[in-house]
Amino acid sequence: MILFFDFERLLYGQAIGDIGPAARLAKVLMPYPQVDLVLTRWRIGAMRSVDDVRGEVPELGDRINDVAHRPVRSDEQPEREITGTLRRTRQLYWAAVVPNWDAHGYIEQATRSGAPLILCPCGFDEEAAQRLQAALARVVFNEELVSGVRRPLHQLGEALPC
């Protein structure tokens, strides 16, 4: 499964450390190692390398698998970074986190595919993190159900919660 996350408007230049949106996103992703994180941007043209971007958000580090950009004018078809990446990776399951003011193309794409779209009116705050966590749980469960590959919920020898 791929999680598309708007880098420039939800992560870049925001508070860093334990209270920032990158740390909040890392915490949400922790239980889901099978989720590939792809950062998106609104400008035209290639983004810096994955290693450069990892340096900008060290809280996410190796969780960043790829960076995607819009291949056309930034005000047209903003969802193309998603459709292009899905075609290239042949991935069916995805979710996206985008700011409210840039949601029109994403809403249409998510509606067509049934993918969850987390809209952020106030940045990637706690409320958005909770909505993302619930969406990831649903999508990962569905992906595992369809593929027949289930991750163990607990390691051998680990105590189960009462």
Label the model's feature ranges.
Residues I2-E76:
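Alpha-helical substrate-recognition element adjacent to the catalytic core
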Residues M1, A26-K27, T85-R90:
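Short amphipathic alpha-helices and their capping/turn segments at secondary-structure boundaries
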Residues G61-C162:
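C-terminal cap/substrate-recognition subdomain and adjoining C-terminal extension
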